[in-house]
C-alpha cells in the first residue's frame, strides 16, 4: 500500500552569503555577456567569454551514491524572486519604478559550495563570483545588473514599464552566470498585471483581480509627502517589526470574525478583504504576527470609520489596533509605533491620523527555484527548472504507477524515490509517468512492506542536476507476503463469489493521495 504526502523535507535557512566584488572591467564584461548573442541553450555567448574547465564537460549521470550524499547533506541552491503582483504604468517621460522593488534572494549552502569549487578548479577568485541581471522581458529596456555585494539578497529599484509597452501582463526575467563563464540560467517571476493608476472610485468585486483576498500575501509601504526617497517598508528583522528602507516583507493577510479574541491561534475566514473588517497580518518568513487590526480607508490625513468597500491594489489604508483607544499602526523613522488619532470635530465618521499611519497596500508573489549539481558543475544552464504541482497514484500491489503533474518537464528527466531511480516515461511538458519501485529496492530482503517507509520524491536531469520537491512517498504495511504467480492464477480462475478479500494477501487497499498545506 502507498501513501502520498506534501511535507517539507528540510527547513529553508539563509546560508551561503556570497562575497562579490567587481572591477569596472568585470562590470563591462558581464554586461557584454547579458547583451551577447542568444545561444540554443537559452544563454548568451560572446567572443570574449572566459573559459571554464567545466565548459565542455560531458553529462555525468547521477549515481545512487551521489543521491545518497545529496540526501544527507542537502547542498541546495535556492533562488527566490519576490515581487508585487501589479505594476503601475509610466506615461511620457515619467518613470514610476516598480514598488516595492523586486528582490532576489540566494538561499542555502549550495551557492557557497559552488563558488569554492569554481574558484579552485579555474584557479581564479573571480571564477566563483555570481553575476545577476534583471529585466521586464522587453527589448526596449536593457537588463539591469543587480548588486550582490557581500549579501544574499539585492533589489532592483529602477525598473519601470512605459506606456509604449502595450502588454497587459509581463514577467520579470533574471539571468545569472558565474565569473568563470558557466551559466546558471534565466529565471522568470510570476505574472505581473499592468495597471494605469490606483482607482479612486468605490471598488466592487466585479474587478476581483484588483481586490485582495483573505490568506493572500501583501506588502505595506509608507511614502512621506509622496517622495520616493522616503519610502519605507514594513519588515521583520531580528524578531522585531520595523520600517526598512532596504528590504520589504511579505505578509499573509487573514480575515477574522469580528468577535474573534486575541490569541496566538485564530480562525480565519474566506472572502475578499473589505474596509472595516478585522484582519491579522502574519509575516510569511518568520510567522510573527501583529495584534488584531481593523483596516480602514484613508482620505488625505483621515481614517474613514464607516467605509465598507473592498480593499484594492495600491490603496492607502490605516490599521487600527482593535479594542484600543484610537491607536493606529504607525512608523517613526525605522521604528513601528502606536499613534493615537484624534476625532474630527466636524466629521464624526473620521479620525485624524499622521502621515506615518498611512500605508499603501499591494499584493505580492514569489517565484522559487531550487536545484543542486549532484555530479558537480555542468556546462548547461539549470533552467528551465521543473516544478511539480501534484501526484496521482494508479494501480497497486505488484504494479503501481505514479503520475507526476507540473510544468517545464522534458524527456531528460527521471523520477527518483529516495536513492532509487524509477523507470520514467515522458508524456508532455506538464506530465511524467513512472513505475513505483519495489520495496526491496529500499529494504534488502523484504518481499512485502513490513513497516512504513517514507522516501522523498525528486526529479533528476540526465546530467546529474537534482530538482528537489516537497513531496514524499510512503510505503504502508501490507497484511502479509505477496502471492506467487501460481496463487494469482488460481485466484483469477476462482468464481468471484468464492473469493474472500482477506484471502488475497499483499494486494491491500489503495490509499488515495491526501494533501496538506505546509
UniProtKB/Swiss-Prot annotation:
Keywords: Activator, Developmental protein, DNA-binding, Notch signaling pathway, Nucleus, Repeat, Repressor, Transcription, Transcription regulation. Residues 22-59 are annotated as: Disordered. Residues 36-50 have a biased composition (Polar residues). InterPro entries: Beta-trefoil_DNA-bd_dom (IPR015350), BTD_sf (IPR036358), CLS_fam (IPR040159), Ig-like_fold (IPR013783), Ig_E-set (IPR014756), p53-like_TF_DNA-bd_sf (IPR008967), RBP-J/Cbf11/Cbf12_DNA-bd (IPR015351), RBP-J/Cbf11_DNA-bd_sf (IPR037095). Residues 24-34 have a biased composition (Basic and acidic residues). Interacts with activated Notch proteins. Belongs to the Su(H) family. This is Suppressor of hairless homolog. It comes from Halocynthia roretzi. The lineage of its organism: Eukaryota, Metazoa, Chordata, Tunicata, Ascidiacea.
Amino acid at each position: 500500500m502507498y501513501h502520498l504526502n506534501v511535507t517539507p523535507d528540510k527547513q529553508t535557512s539563509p546560508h551561503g552569503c556570497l562575497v562579490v566584488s567587481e572591477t569596472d572591467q568585470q562590470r563591462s564584461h558581464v554586461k557584454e555577456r547579458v547583451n551577447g548573442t542568444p545561444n540554443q541553450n537559452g544563454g548568451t555567448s560572446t567572443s570574449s567569454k572566459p573559459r571554464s574547465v567545466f565548459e565542455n564537460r560531458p553529462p555525468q549521470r547521477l549515481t545512487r551514491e551521489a543521491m545518497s550524499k545529496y540526501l544527507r547533506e542537502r547542498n541546495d541552491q535556492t533562488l527566490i524572486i519576490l515581487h508585487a503582483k501589479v505594476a503601475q504604468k509610466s506615461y511620457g517621460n515619467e518613470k514610476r519604478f516598480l514598488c516595492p522593488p523586486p528582490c532576489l534572494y540566494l538561499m542555502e549552502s549550495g551557492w557557497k559550495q559552488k563558488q569554492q569549487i569554481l574558484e579552485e578548479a579555474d584557479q581564479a577568485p573571480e571564477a566563483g563570483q555570481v553575476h545577476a541581471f534583471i529585466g521586464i522581458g522587453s527589448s526596449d529596456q536593457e537588463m539591469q545588473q543587480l548588486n550582490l555585494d557581500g549579501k544574499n539578497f539585492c533589489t532592483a529599484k529602477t525598473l519601470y514599464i512605459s506606456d509604449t509597452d502595450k502588454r497587459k501582463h509581463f514577467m520579470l526575467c533574471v539571468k545569472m552566470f558565474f565569473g568563470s563563464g558557466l551559466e546558471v540560467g534565466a529565471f522568470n517571476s510570476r505574472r505581473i498585471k499592468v495597471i494605469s493608476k490606483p482607482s479612486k472610485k468605490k471598488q466592487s468585486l466585479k474587478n476581483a483581480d484588483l481586490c485582495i483576498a483573505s490568506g493572500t500575501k501583501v506588502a505595506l509601504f509608507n511614502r512621506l509627502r509622496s517622495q520616493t526617497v522616503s519610502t519605507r517598508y514594513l519588515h521583520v528583522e531580528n524578531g522585531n517589526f520595523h520600517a526598512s528602507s532596504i528590504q520589504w516583507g511579505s505578509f499573509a493577510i487573514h480575515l477574522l470574525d469580528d468577535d474573534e479574541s486575541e490569541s496566538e491561534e485564530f480562525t480565519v475566514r474566506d472572502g475578499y478583504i473589505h474596509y472595516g473588517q478585522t484582519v491579522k497580518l502574519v509575516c510569511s518568513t518568520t510567522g510573527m504576527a501583529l495584534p488584531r487590526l481593523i483596516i480602514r480607508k484613508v482620505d488625505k490625513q483621515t481614517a474613514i470609520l464607516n467605509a465598507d468597500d473592498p480593499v484594492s491594489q495600491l490603496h492607502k489604508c490605516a490599521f487600527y489596533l482593535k479594542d484600543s483607544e484610537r491607536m493606529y499602526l504607525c512608523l517613526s523613522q525605522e521604528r513601528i509605533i502606536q499613534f493615537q488619532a484624534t476625532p474630527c470635530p466636524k466629521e464624526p465618521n473620521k479620525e485624524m491620523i499622521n502621515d506615518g499611519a498611512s500605508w499603501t497596500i499591494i499584493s505580492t508573489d514569489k517565484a522559487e527555484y531550487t536545484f543542486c549539481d549532484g555530479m558537480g558543475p555542468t556546462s548547461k544552464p539549470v533552467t528551465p527548472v521543473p516544478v511539480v504541482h501534484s501526484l496521482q497514484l494508479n494501480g497497486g500491489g505488484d504494479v503501481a504507477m505514479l503520475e507526476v503533474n507540473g510544468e517545464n518537464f522534458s524527456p531528460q528527466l527521471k523520477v527518483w524515490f529516495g536513492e532509487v531511480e524509477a523507470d520514467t516515461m515522458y508524456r508532455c511538458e506538464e506530465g511524467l509517468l513512472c513505475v513505483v519501485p519495489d520495496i526491496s529496492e529500499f529494504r534488502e530482503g523484504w518481499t512485502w512492506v513490513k513497516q512504513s517507509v517514507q522516501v522523498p520524491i525528486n526529479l533528476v536531469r540526465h546530467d546529474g542536476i537534482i530538482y528537489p520537491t516537497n513531496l514524499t512517498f510512503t510505503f504502508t504495511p501490507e497484511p502479509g507476503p505477496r502471492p506467487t504467480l501460481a496463487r494469482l492464477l488460481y485466484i483469477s480462475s476462482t468464481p468471484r463469489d468464492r473469493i474472500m478479500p482477506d484471502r488475497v494477501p499483499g494486494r491491500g487497499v489503495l490509499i488515495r493521495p491526501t494533501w496538506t498545506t505546509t
